[in-house]
A protein has these predicted regions:
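Conserved alpha/beta-domain cores
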Residues: 2-361
Length: 361
């Protein structure tokens, strides 16, 4: 935790800055670290990280190989208590601050084994044949998973996953409220490229959330928003902003989609680009202002033209980088979100950006 003179100094920085600094955290432990460092909420919780625990992954795999909706729902019911507990941990640590929960994003094949012995063990545990499981794994493989069956596309194909996650968020919030915790759940739908994708899922989430609140006789303000990580979403932000309560620019994927190369593969040629002065900076570390930044500017202007009060922020790696934070400040975004240990850096960078902006007026 930050203490003593440094705490006083950081409080001066907070008095100056305009941007809120939130954190990317997937569990209560990381959330506590971030709060100790001065984070004012969670800007990104990646729910898929919660599924990789040994007991949970088995039930999630059971859901993946299920043939019917009822079988999938039965498997998801076993995961629901874990998800609920995880969300309760986050709400407790962030008492009074927003917690942005991104629904399932990665393609399903990432949750299945690829080694022969692991496939055989899983087939035995699931009570299916090895050939059946192999066929299932093969059917989920993709040529380009980054642009494949993931994010909101997964949720639209399997709405029962969205229903389970919505229940987990709502029930966790209700239980925390009974303990006197001030809860601010923000549900985030990933990889939206068309407003109709967002509307389809919002029309599942909102009625279910509202019915659970009514059932428990609880009143709670929650938000439903999306990540802007596909160029088309940025270019049609006015359409999406009519439906969404907030946008979070997922600058990692937005950079990949805009440049047309993946972060995982770019290392094969980026060093050559630096040597030959084609690129001066890593676009995955420092936001590309001229390209990706221009899309963010367009999206911000379009969104605010139809929804002036929409909450806008970024939650990629760039959320903890100084020049990227200055860009967000100058554009008038509401917040940046970064990893817990970068929170103090982001707070200082946000203060510096605000001071520089005032000096230039």
């Amino acid at each position: 935790a930050i203490g003593g003179d440094f705490k006083t100094f950081m409080s001066w920085a907070d008095d100056v800055k305009k941007l809120e600094v939130r954190t990317n955290a997937d569990n209560g432990r990381d959330a506590r670290v971030a709060r100790d460092f001065g984070a004012c909420g969670i800007g990104l919780c990646r729910t898929e990280h919660m599924f990789f625990d040994e007991e949970r992954i088995f039930n999630f795999r059971k859901m993946i190989v299920a043939d019917t909706v009822s079988e999938r729902e039965a498997a998801l019911e076993l995961i629901l208590p874990y998800q609920k507990q995880d969300f309760m941990d986050l709400f407790r640590e962030m008492d009074g601050y927003p917690v942005t929960i991104r629904f399932l994003d990665p393609p399903l094949h990432e949750f299945l084994p690829n080694k022969e012995d692991e496939i055989a063990t899983l087939a035995n545990d699931l009570g299916v044949s090895i050939s059946f499981l192999k066929n299932k794994i093969d059917s989920l493989k993709e040529f380009n998973p980054m642009m494949g069956h993931r994010g909101c596309r997964l949720s639209i194909t399997y709405p029962e996953i969205v229903a389970m996650q919505t229940k987990a968020v709502c029930l966790a919030a209700i239980e925390c409220m009974k303990d006197g915790i001030s809860v601010k759940p923000h549900i985030m739908i990933p990889l939206v490229g068309d407003v109709n994708e967002f509307k389809y899922l919002k029309d599942i989430i909102a009625p279910l959330f509202d019915s659970l609140l009514l059932e428990h006789n609880v009143s709670l303000d929650y938000k439903i928003g999306t990540m802007i990580e596909i160029p088309r979403a940025a270019l049609t932000a006015d359409e999406i902003a009519k439906e969404a309560d907030f946008f979070s620019f997922g600058t990692n994927d937005l950079t990949q989609m805009t440049y047309g190369f993946s972060r995982d593969d770019a290392s094969k040629f980026l060093n050559c680009y630096y040597d030959k002065k084609i690129f001066l900076n890593d676009p995955f570390v420092r936001l590309d202002i001229n390209g990706v930044g221009e899309l963010i500017k367009i999206a911000t202007a379009k969104a605010r033209s139809v929804n002036p009060k929409i909450d806008l922020g970024i939650c990629g790696e760039h959320g903890g980088e100084e020049t990227s934070i200055k860009f967000c400040n100058d554009l008038g975004l509401n917040y940046v979100s970064c990893s817990p240990y970068r929170v103090p850096i982001a707070r200082l960078a946000a203060a510096k950006a605000a001071i520089m902006e005032n000096d230039n007026k």
